[in-house]
Amino acid sequence: MKIENKEIASNWFTDLRDLLCKEFEKIEEEYAQTKGLKPAKFVRTSWQRNGGGGGIMSLMKGEVFEKVGVNISTVFGEFSPEFRSEIPGAELDGKFFATGISLVAHLKSPLIPAMHFNTRYIETSKSWFGGGGDLTPFYPKENETAKFHAAFKEACDKYDSSYYPKFKKQCDEYFYLKHRKEPRGVGGIFYDYLNSGNFEQDFAFTQDVGRALLSVYPEIVRSKLFLPWTTEQKEYQLIRRGRYVEFNLLYDRGTKFGLMTDGNVEAILMSLPPEVKFN
């Protein structure tokens, strides 16, 4: 029996979740061993959506990762009439299917960048992939930013040389706080409504975006795992985290999509940092 595109995409997002959680737990173990501490582990919580589907939220609060969440979800049903006009292909009957993975990491150390990543596959009367990854350092380092971008550029160039400059630009434009006239972090890539007419190619690209993240971000975290930091640096991190909150509540499409489709509120707002200061 032929496996549907929906199932192919959903299975990959589950596999990627397992790979990411395993790698992040390994980092916690490496740190805990040197400090004589018990390493943190992910706690998984399942949820069901009224109307169809559900997901699993994986959350870890450790000594390295102050809060890291990896969500997978597969939901289906009908958009509300007022939301249909905003989604391509949903105008007529409002029916949709959406599966994806979403990851947000907030680190205890203010020297280690926060990171956001997601990839998804959506079907209405049309179908497409979307997603990307972006880095939010509080103390940016050029070599670190370059390494993060290089990983995604390599994934993009494998498929289309126009992808990286286009998706980088879309990331810069998307992760921008208009009310403050400043970017959120140092960017990465962001793509949406990707349908080249070749599902296998678009799916393979989306897989490689996930693998790129898996190759580069743990390396960045490990490079600063044991660097000392000051209370002043931590204070600055907490204040800058406020920008993260502002963006996610005011502009984030995933937050809006989740709330409009009656998703799990805890999973949707998992992206918010555990501690933040507004001065």
Swiss-Prot record:
The keyword Metal-binding applies. One of its GO terms (cellular component) is cytoplasm. It is found in: Cytoplasm. GO terms for molecular function: coproporphyrinogen oxidase activity; metal ion binding; protein homodimerization activity. The active site is at H116. The record marks H179 as: Important for dimerization. The keyword Oxidoreductase applies. SUPFAM superfamilies: Coproporphyrinogen III oxidase. It catalyses: coproporphyrinogen III + O2 + 2 H(+) = protoporphyrinogen IX + 2 CO2 + 2 H2O. Substrate binds at S102, N118, T119, R120. Its cofactor is a divalent metal cation. It is an enzyme of class 1 (oxidoreductase). It holds the Pfam family Coprogen_oxidas. Pathway: Porphyrin-containing compound metabolism; protoporphyrin-IX biosynthesis; protoporphyrinogen-IX from coproporphyrinogen-III (O2 route): step 1/1. InterPro entries: Coprogen_oxidase_aer (IPR001260), Coprogen_oxidase_aer_sf (IPR036406), Coprogen_oxidase_CS (IPR018375). GO terms for biological process: protoporphyrinogen IX biosynthetic process. A divalent metal cation binds at H106, H116, H149, H179. It comes from the Bacteria. Keywords: Cytoplasm, Heme biosynthesis, Metal-binding, Oxidoreductase, Porphyrin biosynthesis. Its EC number is 1.3.3.3. Involved in the heme biosynthesis. Catalyzes the aerobic oxidative decarboxylation of propionate groups of rings A and B of coproporphyrinogen-III to yield the vinyl groups in protoporphyrinogen-IX. Belongs to the aerobic coproporphyrinogen-III oxidase family. Homodimer. This is Oxygen-dependent coproporphyrinogen-III oxidase. It comes from Rickettsia felis (strain ATCC VR-1525 / URRWXCal2). The lineage of its organism: Bacteria, Pseudomonadati, Pseudomonadota, Alphaproteobacteria, Rickettsiales.
